[in-house]
Amino acid sequence: MERTKWTIPIVALGYWSAALTNGALRVIVPIYFASRGVSISKIAFLFFLFKFAEIFAPFGIGVMLNRWGYKRTFITGLAIHSVISAFYMVPNFFFLYLERFVRGLLYMADMSAVYVKHFSAKENQRFLINMMLGLKEASKGVGMIGGGLLIAILTIENTLLIFAAFTAVSALVAVKYLPDLQEQVKMPVLKIWGAVDRKIKTLGLSFGLLNGALDAWGVVVLPVYLTHLGVTPTFVGTVMMAEYVFQGLIVTFFSKYVNLRWEPRKLLMLAGLLLVPVSLALSFAATLHLFLIVVFTYMFLFSGAMVYYNHLMIEFASAEKTSLDLATYTTLSNIFKPIGVFVSGILVESFGFGWAYYLSALFVLFSALTCIALPKAATQKDQAGDYRTESVTVR
């Protein structure tokens, strides 16, 4: 018991250190390569590879968690995160493509969420999962401003080595102190999809469409558009940092006081319907200040919806096969991200920035409509969910 009380902080340290690096790359990659004349579509392809890998990552991670155990999978992910940062030392786009794809496969969210499911009391899980995922966004924001500042004074290689040190230290801490857990249910890969409850699939699909909407303008278009408005790379990093820190704080604190008596299904539909006009408003925001106001309005609504998605994700996942249920959910929640990034890059180059926001509005609308298929109230009655459950083995 003494050992397990530090489990969530150790997992959070590793998860947030990986998010720090991912956040830095969100700023470093588009700014660095755009300054060297690389086209928007080619930069978008780098992020497309990352998002494309995220489609396949959850099932791979889920199977590894189910077969290898939680600790070995978590440490392996952090170690690879550290190693591939060195790929930027090789002046060849092949290694950049490889780094983007491999980093996308290292989906730390599921590696962390399984620990929340099994190593925390059920009444605390809603807050802990939203705190972990919310402050992950804040860590990403800190990485963005850190990356923007460091790339201004250091080479891209040295900048990435600094961030690699954070994940390396987190991996060493996990090796020493993180407990292991083995799931007893071992399901054949080809039977996973059919064994997962329909409500988890519906929830994942809806959140996937919402994620696709955000990434359609928030990954490549946002930093490039801000640069197009004449702002400095440091300002771009500051805006993106503030955006993600804002999201992280909203998710974390809103989850503490959210009223779960409100039906999540209706709230998710309402949030989606409100985001449609906000997405369209981005295309009409002609000045920098107005544009930023609309961006943060979008992030406020998105973050509020995210609290309910995160809560229902943990609530719907079974204790016996947590990793496989979450693998299905996160696969669906990631499937539209590369589509949003890649298609918006083509649309922007062909028709202008406004088309990225039109695409975003379309994704949001489909997300809201998908919520109609969710159950009217959470019906998950499974009370097994902490490290004492008989369906798992702690080591």
What spans do the regions from the language model cover?
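Helix-to-loop junctions at the C-terminal end of transmembrane segments
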Residues: 57-69, 151, 250-263, 348-349
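Structural signature of the two symmetry-related core transmembrane helices
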Residues: 72-86, 164, 266-280, 361
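Helix-loop boundary and gating motifs at the non-cytosolic
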Residues: 2-51, 199-239
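C-terminal transmembrane helical hairpin of 12-TM major facilitator-type secondary transporters
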Residues: 265-309
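Cytoplasmic helix-loop-helix junction between adjacent transmembrane helices
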Residues: 101-138
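Symmetry-related core transmembrane helices of the 12-TM Major Facilitator Superfamily/SLC fold
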Residues: 159-175, 357-373
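Hydrophobic core of transmembrane alpha-helices in multi-pass small-molecule transporters
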Residues: 16, 94-109, 290-304
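Juxtamembrane intracellular "pre-TM" segments in multi-pass secondary transporters
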Residues: 1-5, 178-211, 390-395
